[in-house]
UniProtKB/Swiss-Prot annotation:
The protein's name in its UniProt record: Mediator of RNA polymerase II transcription subunit 1
One BP annotation, GO: cellular response to thyroid hormone stimulus
Gly residues: compositionally biased ranges: 961-970, 1217-1228, 1308-1328
Motif (LXXLL motif 1): 585-589
Superkingdom in the source lineage: Eukaryota
Residue ranges with Basic residues bias: 1494-1503
Gene: med1
UniProt feature, compositional bias: Basic and acidic residues: 675-687, 946-958, 1347-1359, 1504-1516
The protein's assembly and partners: Component of the Mediator complex.
């Protein structure tokens, strides 16, 4: 121890120097100071926490708190001398807080650089409430405004730039409100800058750009948040973006002065006008404007690219890593939770809903079309330089956020057990950056269902439901769309869909049974024929028309225009077939009259019941509801009428189709009964039933089920729904009464109101959406009927879709609906894949004759029809080709005879005939197309055979159809085009037909009971153009020829073939292609021949519109060619007939042929696209051509009560409006389109001869159309066509006496050519010169002139001419009779000049058809001599160069060789220079007709011989060239040979060659050959 002390002493014995000691102390002190700094900060934090906890109640406490807040934000503060003013300052701004002596806040002012202090209400409110936290945030915001590296000068410029941007955005918001008077919610969702909240204090300007439905509900109370101008909108509500300026590494030229000039918008959307950027109003700054998100939002790669494209500034660098978009959405949604915690979800989420438990699997890695998964990134801000970029950026962000909202609705923190009972599994997979699918098990069937949601923008989501063809209906696309747009929640929507399906199932107990039956039938592959119908339906379903409300609206419009026609043309046949074939449906609908008492009832029964029914669609007529649905309203009211329409849409087999089908849904019902009835006529009960089931299965059990269930069981409301949708048909008034009287069930259904309520109850939600539905006709088969109504039947639907698509897209589409890419793809697939909903599958299953499918005209027609009907591509149509034939099978009983493609009626070359029939003669297929083919290739056979059969059996219908199936086109055209002329002159025939129509239809049903007919009925709808009501009927008219054996009890001026032009179809088909009408008229005509009705009904409306007619032609009719679904079908018929006749391709495509197609026909021989692609042509077709055809139809219409009145008015329009349209279509087109009817008629007449009847009917129709067109087009085209046509038919079919009588009655305007006269003379002649007017006024050539013509026609008919009064029918009857039958009984129906209801003046036994044909020819010759030619010529010249040579020739060429052949031949025969005679005007025509009559008589003799020869030749070439009928129109069609042939033979042969060759090689060939 001592040693230790010693050492210590020695060590410290020396004293340290003082300086060293001081240094040591300082070191220690410095260390201590350093240590104290942390402690000091800690102490400061503690003091601040204490201050926050203390209550500020004094002046000193308030000032202390303010100083503390300033320090926290790096700002300086000081007090005024009196201590009541506190200043918080920086270099760029300062705050002035005014206090009273008690420490109470008086005011808070903010002063930015060089600005005067401005009071800030928000800061005042926050300080008064002692909300110092928010006050502090304001200070931070103010500091951030100037957070830019640089000096004060740069910061000042940046502030000026931000200020100018804010001023511009504020002005944009004001201008938008001024222009739209938008509500707060509308501003948020649609405003150019959203809902703008100006910068206040430290809070920058914010733009509220999106609010989801759930954002508007108060989580606490569950009450809805009210957004109104008077109340402040919470900043936190919905999605917001802040407007700021921030420093960047790049230099940008930013405006420092406001750029908006003026205070008014440049448009109704609130778009302002900006001044250009100059050096005076802008500066280059190392900064940029930004839209900043409170939290980064998930944005897909595609949207990032769109935004970058908009702003021109990259958002991310090239090395940025993208992540699966669904994963980002999941993170974003889960981060919204107040207590976000880790959740082991594996992209599987659960939702517990009332009564349902859902499990959602988000397939984040699902490959997109490009093979990559949907990827995105989190975006926090978007740079931009100009205020005009803000609206575009917000629109894109809204779109993305809407998509994210739907996907995010599946993301829940709810946890359920995997084995939870009743747990429903759903898979959500992306299809694109804005589209995704939700797959789940069908609520009823053991199959997979898929709902595709396409987020088109922030407020429009298009939904489509895809299910199996035989799956029970679930709900409509529109219903789904409505639900989604209301809630923007997938779980809620899935629950609604399931509940709706349960409701429907509960309401339709028979659905399951029906579904099973249908499935069995499908498995057995029973009636492929029905597949065509379904094919169309499928096509529809394949089509994608958005069902979203917006889409729905468009579709509805489309449907209103085009769907009506479509419904008429396509829907009826298919639906009818289904109904009639299905005993359950039949019993439900009590379809006894039309179907012949029962589905299995004898064809004669239907014929007897016809008086009440009065048309082939008598079934429908019996069913007032069905009639209504099948008639005009189908298009108009369908979507609007039936809010429940969605339900029907639900029935659609393919959701994609469902949209359009919605509108169609309501009407298809009636159509379906109609179709069934007609088919029933042709087929045996078992066959029909099988076909019905098969069709239903093909198109979709749902529709079928619904239809059946609705009508038969407790779901009358469902079926009625379809009916309801179609209840409003105006054109079908007459039919409706018949339907009512005939159908009790229908009466029930007719009680649209009663049904609607039921449907509404069943589909209350759907009903609401139904109005929006564009027409989901996806499940065409069953609901397809309803859909069909909307879309005009299964085919109609498809047509409708196509049309809609075209309309909308030319809409549609229809609903629109479309418009919908996915559905379209589906359609394409469907036509490409037999499994698809589209008709393809069915088509493939149908036993079509390869020739039929491949036949030029048939396949062309099929394609046309498909094109019209469906949006799907040519493949779809091609698939339809078979179906079309199948539809035609109505004519040839495709399904029945399946592979044969044979015309049951015994068409010459069955296979060929069938194809021809299907293309040329089958109304079902597309009257004109079928008819045209028939009239071309098969016409001779059909004409002769059919004509003969017809007198014997249902042939009458076919004859009436246009010389049988062959004359179908002609008939259709003639009925449609000639329909008007027929209406008057043909009215006898028409009326007889109208009245006989039901019989015919029954006949057709008994005769054309073949499933194929039924099945083909769907195609009939397209064909239906002629007979709007019952496409099937129309097709049937063709089908009956194929099937027809039983003679029709009543022949409306229906000289077996002459009947081709059916007054009834005319009545409906006045607008729609007359030919179709004709053809359909006698048979399919339910007061509106299936085709004629559809087109004519449509056209009527169109016609009445005049220009409107054109629109329909081009839009409604133009969709397809005009006439929406039916019109399109009819147009197709007509146009096809025309186009086909005129141009083989057209005929083939039939599409070309919509009267509107006329131009397509000529212009686009292949027509399908032509029609679609030639709206102008469509237009012409609709107005003039359709008008004309309508005229023919009108004649027929006249017999049909609805038609007479409506057709006349529309006819009145026809010549003019129609003509104008034709004209607009192009004189040439008029010829072609007008030719739709003309060509159809003439073409048919000449080409196929479409059995003289067809030919003449066609001629008449053509003439009528031509006349109408001519008058509109300058009278040249029409006259040319009319004359040409008129002459041909006149010569062909109308006896000289008839021609003379017609001339006398019609005057020169009559155009002298009996049959053709109505169109040609009455319509044609009248149309040509003044006649054009006469024609218009007279039911577009038939009405005004027809009365006279009709009376004379009746006389003529009684003479056997059968052509006089009902020029078309007569002619057709006469000529056709001649060509196809030896003799026949014709009922002469005379319509009043004013277009009053027609009366049957007498029943006449047609004298030798050949004579009739010759007579018609003579008359046609007269016509040729008549002014029609001159009128026609100018028109043709006007319309197309091809017509320049000579009106007659030109029209011929334009008209398709058919018209060229028939008309041209006639012209050539009579008037070698068509234009020279045309110039003659009415008087000239009359004189010409007189002289021509003599000449005709002489030529009749020759023609008879030639016709016989030609018939033989045709029979030979018939089978050989269904497609190349053009080579030998005469050969192809005896009738043609008779009407056109004899004309051709009489020196027309050579002449036609030039023009024909010019326009249609094939058609040209025919005349040349002749």
């Amino acid at each position: 121890m001592s040693s230790l002390l010693e050492r210590l002493h020695s060590k410290y014995s020396q004293n340290r120097p003082w300086p060293e000691t001081i240094k040591l102390v300082r070191q220690i002190m410095e260390k201590r100071t350093g240590m104290m700094s942390g402690s000091h900060q800690h102490l400061v934090t503690c003091l601040e926490t204490l201050q926050k906890a203390l209550k500020v109640s004094s002046l000193s406490a308030m000032t202390d708190r303010l100083e503390s807040i300033a320090r926290q934000n790096g700002l300086t503060s000081h007090l005024s001398p009196n201590g009541t003013e506190c200043y918080i300052t920086t270099d760029m701004f300062y705050l002035e807080v005014l206090l009273d002596t008690e420490g109470q806040l008086c005011d808070v002012k903010v002063a930015h650089h060089r600005e005067n202090p401005v009071s800030c209400p928000e800061l005042v409110e926050q300080l008064r409430e002692k909300n110092f936290e928010d006050f502090s945030q304001h200070l931070k915001g103010l500091v951030n405004l100037y957070k830019v590296p640089g000096d004060n000068k740069l910061e000042t410029k940046m502030y000026l730039a931000l200020q100018s941007l804010e001023l511009d955005l504020t002005k944009m918001a004001a201008i938008y409100w001024q222009a739209t008077n938008a509500t707060v919610l509308e501003k948020i969702l649609h405003g150019t800058v959203g809902y703008l909240t100006p910068r206040s204090g430290g809070q920058v300007m914010s733009l509220k750009y999106y609010v989801s439905p759930y954002d508007l509900f108060d989580d606490g109370t569950g009450a809805s948040i009210s957004l109104s101008e008077g109340h402040a909108v919470p900043r936190s509500l919905g999605m917001n973006v802040s407007v700021t300026i921030e420093a960047t590494t790049s230099m940008y030229k930013l405006p420092i002065a406001p750029l908006i000039v003026g205070s008014h918008a440049m448009d109704n959307k609130g778009t302002p006008s900006f001044t250009s950027i100059t050096n005076a109003n802008s500066v280059d700054l190392p900064a940029c404007f930004f839209l900043k998100f409170p939290q980064p939002i998930p944005v897909s790669r595609a949207f990032i690219q769109k935004i970058e494209h908009c702003t021109g500034i990259p958002l991310i660098d090239g090395s940025h890593t993208f992540l699966p978009h669904y994963e980002l959405v999941t993170q974003f949604e889960l981060a919204k939770e107040k207590d976000p915690g880790p959740l082991n979800h594996n992209m599987r989420f659960y939702a517990s809903l009332p009564g349902q438990q859902h499990c959602y699997f988000l397939n984040k890695d699902a490959p997109l079309p490009d093979g990559r998964s949907l990827q995105g990134t989190l975006l926090s801000k978007i740079p931009f330089q100009h205020p005009s970029r803000v609206p575009v950026i917000l629109s894109l962000i809204r779109h993305q956020v809407a998509y994210n909202t739907l996907i995010g609705s599946c993301v829940k923190r709810t946890m359920l057990k995997e084995d939870c009972p009743g747990l429903l599994q759903f898979e959500v997979a992306p299809l694109s950056d804005s589209c995704f699918s939700i797959s789940f098990q069908h609520p009823v069937n053991d199959s997979l269902v898929c709902v595709v949601m396409d987020v088109q923008d922030s407020t429009h989501v298009s939904c489509k439901l895809y299910k199996g063809l035989s799956d029970a209906l679930i709900c409509t696309d529109d219903f789904i769309t409505k639900v989604v747009q209301r809630c923007m929640s997938i779980p809620v929507t899935m629950r609604a869909i399931r509940r709706k399906a349960e409701t429907i199932q509960a309401d339709t107990p028979a659905l399951s049974l029906i579904a099973e039956t249908v499935e069995d039938m499908v498995k057995k592959n029973l009636p492929p024929a029905s597949s065509p119908g379904y094919g169309m339906t499928s096509a529809l379903s394949g089509l994608t028309t958005p069902t979203s409300s917006y889409t729905s609206g468009q579709n509805s419009s489309l449907f209103n225009m085009g769907m009506k026609e479509r419904h008429d043309s396509t829907g009826h046949g298919d639906d009818f077939n289904k109904v009639t074939q299905n005993p359950i449906l039949t019993s439900l609908l009590q379809i006894t009259n039309n179907t012949g008492g029962t589905l299995g009832s004898s064809p004669t029964q239907p014929q007897h019941t016809p008086p009440p029914v009065s048309s082939p669609a008598s079934n429908t007529k019996n069913h007032p509801m069905l009639m209504n649905l099948l008639k005009d309203n189908p298009a108009q009211d369908f979507s609007n009428l039936y809010g429940g329409s969605p339900m029907e849409r639900q029935n659609s087999s393919g959701s994609p189709r469902t949209e359009l089908g919605a509108s169609a849904t309501g009407k298809p019902k009636k159509k379906r009964p109609r179709t069934g009835a007609e088919k029933m006529k042709n087929q045996t009960e078992d066959d029909f039933q099988r076909e019905l089931f098969s069709m239903d299965v093909d198109s979709q059990n749902t529709i079928f089920d619904v239809g059946m269930a609705g009508d038969a069981l407790d779901t009358p409301h469902i079926t009625p729904a379809p009916s309801q949708c179609g209840t409003p048909p105006t054109v079908y008034q007459q039919s409706i009464p018949h339907a009512q009287s005939n159908m009790q069930r229908m009466v029930r259904i007719p009680s649209t109101d009663a049904i609607i309520p039921d449907v509404t109850d069943i589909l209350s939600d759907i009903a609401e959406e139904a109005s929006k539905l564009s027409g989901p006709g996806e499940d065409c088969p069953n609901l397809g009927t309803p859909v069909r109504d909307s879309s005009s039947s299964g085919h109609s639907q498809s047509t409708l879709f196509d049309t809609d698509v075209f309309q909308v897209d030319g809409g549609g589409g229809s609903g629109g609906e479309n418009p919908y890419p996915d559905p379209v793809d589906l359609i394409v697939d469907s036509h490409g894949s037999p499994n698809s909903d589209s008709p393809n599958t069915f088509f493939n299953s149908v036993d079509f004759n390869p020739d039929l499918l491949n036949s030029q005209s048939q396949s062309g027609f099929t394609d046309d029809l498909n094109d019209d009907s469906s949006q799907s591509g040519d493949n779809d149509f091609k698939d339809f080709a078979g179906p079309g034939l199948a539809s035609l099978n109505i004519v040839s009983g495709l399904p029945v005879d399946g592979g044969d493609g044979k015309y049951k009626m015994g068409l010459g070359a069955d296979t060929l005939d069938f194809s021809i029939i299907s293309t040329g003669g089958s109304k079902t297929l597309g009257g004109p197309d079928i008819q045209e083919t028939q009239s071309r290739s098969q016409s001779p056979l059909l004409s002769n055979d059919l004509g003969k059969d017809r007198p014997q059996k249902q042939k009458v219908k076919e004859s009436s159809n246009g010389g049988g199936a062959g004359g179908g086109l002609s008939g259709m055209q003639s009925a449609g085009m000639e329909g008007k002329s027929m209406k008057r002159s043909r009215t006898p025939s028409s009326d007889g037909k109208s009245k006989d129509k039901p019989p015919k239809r029954k006949k057709t049903e008994s005769d054309g009971k073949s499933p194929s007919h039924i099945t083909n009925r769907p195609f009939t709808p397209p064909t239906s153009t002629g007979g709007s009501k019952s496409p099937g009927t129309s097709g049937r008219s063709q089908t009956p020829p194929g099937m027809a054996t039983p003679p029709i009890p009543k022949i409306t001026i229906q000289i077996p073939k002459g009947t081709v032009s059916v007054g009834k179809p005319s009545s409906h088909g006045q607008y729609s292609s007359s030919g179709s009408s004709s053809s359909s008229s006698s048979k399919s005509h339910h007061g509106h021949s299936s085709l004629s009705s559809s087109a004519s009904g449509k056209i009527k409306s169109n016609k009445s519109d005049g220009s409107s007619g054109m629109k329909i032609g081009s839009s409604g009719g133009g969709m397809y060619s005009g006439q929406s679904g039916q019109s399109s079908s009819q147009s197709k018929n007509s146009s096809q007939s025309m186009g086909k006749a005129g141009s083989s391709p057209i005929t083939k495509h039939g599409l070309s042929s919509n009267v509107s197609n006329s131009s397509g026909s000529k212009t686009k021989p292949q027509g399908k696209p032509s029609v679609l692609m030639n709206p102008s042509l469509s237009k012409p077709n609709i107005s003039p051509s359709h008008s004309r055809p309508s005229g023919g139809s009108d004649k027929m219409s006249s017999p049909m009560k609805p038609m007479p009145g409506t057709p006349p008015s529309s006819k009145a329009k026809s010549p003019i409006g129609s003509g104008g349209q034709h004209l607009s279509g192009g004189g040439s087109n008029s010829t072609t389109k007008s030719s739709s009817g003309l060509v159809s008629s003439g073409s048919l007449s000449q080409k196929p001869n479409s059995s003289s009847s067809s030919s003449s009917s066609s001629s008449s129709s053509s003439s009528s159309s031509s006349s109408s067109s001519s008058s509109f087009c300058g009278g040249v085209s029409q006259n040319l066509h009319g004359n040409s046509k008129g002459k041909s038919p006149s010569r062909n079919k109308k006896p000289s006496l008839t021609a003379v009588i017609d001339k006398l009655k019609h005057g020169v305007g009559t155009g002298g050519p009996g049959s053709e006269d109505p169109m040609d003379g009455g319509g044609g002649g009248g149309s040509t010169g003044a006649p054009s007017h006469g024609m218009s006024s007279k039911h577009g050539m038939v009405v005004g002139e027809f009365p006279t013509k009709r009376e004379k026609s009746e006389k003529d008919k009684s003479k056997g001419s059968g052509s006089g009064g009902s020029s078309d029918p007569s002619k057709k009857g006469g000529g056709d009779s001649k060509g196809s039958v030896g003799t026949g009984v014709a009922k002469i129906i005379i319509s009043k000049h004013d277009g009053g209801s027609p009366s049957i003046k007498a029943k006449v036994t047609l004298q030798k058809p050949e004579g009739g044909g010759d007579g018609l020819r003579s008359q046609m010759q007269k016509n040729y001599g008549s002014p029609l030619i001159s009128g026609s010529t100018p028109k043709h010249e006007r319309c197309s160069p091809s017509h320049n040579k000579s009106p007659a020739y030109t029209p011929q060429a334009l008209d398709s060789e058919s018209e060229s052949g028939s008309s041209s031949i006639a012209e050539k025969s009579y008037q070698n220079s068509p234009s020279s005679d045309d110039g003659g005007g009415s008087g000239s025509r009359a004189q010409t007709e007189y002289s021509a009559e003599k000449h005709k008589k002489h030529k009749k003799e020759k023609k008879r011989l030639k016709d016989k020869d030609r018939d033989r030749e045709k029979k030979k070439s018939y089978g050989m060239k269904p497609e190349s009928w053009s080579k030998s129109p005469i050969s192809a069609d005896p009738t043609m040979a008779m009407s056109g042939g004899s004309m051709m033979s009489s020196d027309r042969g050579v002449r036609p060659t030039p023009s024909f060759l010019m326009d249609d090689d094939d058609l040209m060939d025919v005349p040349l050959t002749l």
